[in-house]
């Protein structure tokens, strides 16, 4: 594995007029890893990608992609990367095969048919090679777009929110394909607002409102989260949430389906006795206020818990921070 990163971003800032879309962003993407830029809409993910791809010039800082300066060496860079944008353009009146053929010609790929067959087999699209793109489902269109993006065998695959608007089954299938590509040695840089997808990345950068909050492996971020978290199943849920937020020993309350996650103020996860005592106190308090408590138990933090904590530590508003 080469020691030189495939992507190196150092102190990058990009503005749109008076609006700072990305501020002093620094991170590296290592060869052979799947790296995720994670954050809500407006976090600066797409702007950062466009600077990395050479579609925008930074106003400050430096960026190197595949060892090249993206803006100055854009033509050479385009031969070495694949970019699946949020609005990748397929030709609806062309078949699957014809779309792939078209993109192979754009990239000047010679003898591309064996590569096409390999990709169609990987994507389980061989039976549909004669179908018009307009007649494919949303998930199948996304697979075809991926095949077109990979036809020239890039060393870096960049994907901007590739599963937005895709049904859950197709979304899961698409990420399995990306994981397969990564295991085969391809370097991937992907943006997503979905924290469950971030779990599939080797490392992630959490972004919010143009600022980089942290860069690390998801497992490391979870291990470093210090304050204990209680998972609470109580009804009515709304009243339970309101009461928990009134308690001085509760630092934060987040909703996860039917359950609540209450972060305890000043109680470390490494102190199970204190966590157990706090759980008993919270359960008793909720019951005293007429709230039915089914269960209270300590749990490991989710990436959403960590993201919220990082946003709060940075002094930012947590509203609409995650999906």
Question: Can you describe what each PLM-predicted range is?
Answer:
Residues 1-13, 313-323:
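ABC-family P-loop ATPase nucleotide-binding domain
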Residues 4-7, 14-207:
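ABC transporter nucleotide-binding domains
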Residues 85-88, 225, 229:
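Short amphipathic alpha-helical interaction patches enriched in hydrophobic/aromatic residues
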Residues 205-206, 309-312:
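Short low-complexity, flexible loop/linker segments enriched in glycine and/or proline
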Residues 215-216:
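ABC ATPase "signature
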Residues 219-224:
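Short acidic-hydrophobic catalytic motif
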Residues 226-310, 323:
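Short, charged/small-residue-rich alpha-helical element at the C-terminal edge
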């Amino acid at each position: 594995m080469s020691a030189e990163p495939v992507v190196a971003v150092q102190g990058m800032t990009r503005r749109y007029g008076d609006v700072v879309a990305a501020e002093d962003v620094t991170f590296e993407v290592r060869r052979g890893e799947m790296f995720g830029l994670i954050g809500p809409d407006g976090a600066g993910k797409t702007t950062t990608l466009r600077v990395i791809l050479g579609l925008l010039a930074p106003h400050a800082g430096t960026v190197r992609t595949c060892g090249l300066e993206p803006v100055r060496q854009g033509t050479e860079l385009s031969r070495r990367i694949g970019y699946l944008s949020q609005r990748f353009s397929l030709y609806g009146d062309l078949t699957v095969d014809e779309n792939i053929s078209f993109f192979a010609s754009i990239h000047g790929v010679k003898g591309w048919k064996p590569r096409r067959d390999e990709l169609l087999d990987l994507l389980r699209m061989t039976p549909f090679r004669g179908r018009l793109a307009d007649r494919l489902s949303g998930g199948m269109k996304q697979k075809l777009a991926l095949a077109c993006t990979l036809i020239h065998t890039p060393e870096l695959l960049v994907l901007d929110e590739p599963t937005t608007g895709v049904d859950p089954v197709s979304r899961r299938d698409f990420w399995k394909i990306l994981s397969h590509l990564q295991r085969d040695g391809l370097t991937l840089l992907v943006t997503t607002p979905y924290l469950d997808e971030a779990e599939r990345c080797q490392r992630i950068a959490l972004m919010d409102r143009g600022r980089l909050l942290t860069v690390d492996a998801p497992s490391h971020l979870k291990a470093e989260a210090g304050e204990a978290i209680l998972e609470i199943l109580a009804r009515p849920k709304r009243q339970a949430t309101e009461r928990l937020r009134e308690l001085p020993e509760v630092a934060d309350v987040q909703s996860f389906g039917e359950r609540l996650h209450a972060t305890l103020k000043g109680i470390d996860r490494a102190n199970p006795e204190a966590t157990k005592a706090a759980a008993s106190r919270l359960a008793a308090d909720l019951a005293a206020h007429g709230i039915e408590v089914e269960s209270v138990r300590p749990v490991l933090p989710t990436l959403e818990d960590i993201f919220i904590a990082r946003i709060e530590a940075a002094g930012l508003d947590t509203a609409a921070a995650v999906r």
